[in-house]
C-alpha cells in the first residue's frame, strides 16, 4: 500500500467560525441545497455526527459515480478542524483502500478565512493515483466552497 498526499488551500471572505458552522457542521443539509449539481443528498447512516459517524453522499445523474460513504474521524470545534475518510464507493475499490481528508479553516487578519485541505490517497498494491482523480477532488471542493460562500453572502443572518 502506498500513500499519495496533496494539499489544497482556498481563501474565503467568510469568517472562519461562520464558514465552519455552514461548510462543516451543516454541510450535509447545505450542500444539496446550494450545489445540487455536485451533491444530490447526504444521508446519515450511523452515528450522531461525531467521530465514527457514517454518511452516504449521493451524486446527481451523469456524475462519474453514484455515491461515496464517509466516516467522520474528528470534529474539533475549537480549532475549526474536521477529518473524515472516504471508505466506500466512488474511487474507493480496486485501486484505493480509502481517502483520508483533513479540513482546517483558519482565520485571516482581514476577517476572512483560509480553507486548508490535506488529502491522503491510500492505494492498494502498487497502484498510483490518477491526475484526473486529484483534479476532480479539487474541483468538487472549490464548487462546494464557492456555493456555500455565495449562500452566506446572500444570507447575512445565516450561521452566525
From Swiss-Prot:
SMART domains: Bet_v_1. GO terms for biological process: abscisic acid-activated signaling pathway; defense response. One of its GO terms (cellular component) is cytoplasm. GO terms for molecular function: abscisic acid binding; protein phosphatase inhibitor activity; signaling receptor activity. Its main location: cytoplasm. Keywords: Allergen, Cytoplasm, Pathogenesis-related protein, Plant defense. InterPro entries: Bet_v_I/MLP (IPR000916), Bet_v_I_allergen (IPR024949), Plant_def-hormone_signal (IPR050279), START-like_dom_sf (IPR023393). Brassinolide binds at residues 55, 82, 84, 101. Signal peptide: none annotated. It is found in: Cytoplasm. Pfam families: Bet_v_1 (PF00407). The keyword Cytoplasm applies. It comes from the Eukaryota. The keyword Nucleotide-binding does not apply. May be a general steroid carrier protein. Belongs to the BetVI family. This is Major pollen allergen Bet v 1-F/I. It comes from Betula pendula.
Amino acid at each position: 500500500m502506498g500513500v499519495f498526499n496533496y494539499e489544497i488551500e482556498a481563501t474565503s471572505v467568510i469568517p472562519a467560525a461562520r464558514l465552519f458552522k455552514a461548510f462543516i457542521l451543516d454541510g450535509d443539509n447545505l450542500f444539496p441545497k446550494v450545489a445540487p449539481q455536485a451533491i444530490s443528498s447526504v444521508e446519515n447512516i450511523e452515528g450522531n455526527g461525531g467521530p465514527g459517524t457514517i454518511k452516504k453522499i449521493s451524486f446527481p445523474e451523469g456524475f462519474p459515480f453514484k455515491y461515496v460513504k464517509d466516516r467522520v474521524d474528528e470534529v474539533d470545534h475549537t480549532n475549526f478542524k474536521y477529518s473524515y475518510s472516504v471508505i466506500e464507493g466512488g474511487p474507493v475499490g480496486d485501486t484505493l483502500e480509502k481517502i483520508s481528508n483533513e479540513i482546517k479553516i483558519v482565520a485571516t487578519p482581514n476577517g476572512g478565512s483560509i480553507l486548508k485541505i490535506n488529502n491522503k490517497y491510500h492505494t492498494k498494491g502498487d497502484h498510483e493515483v490518477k491526475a484526473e482523480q486529484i483534479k476532480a477532488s479539487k474541483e468538487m471542493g472549490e464548487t462546494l466552497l464557492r456555493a456555500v460562500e455565495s449562500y452566506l453572502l446572500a444570507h447575512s443572518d445565516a450561521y452566525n
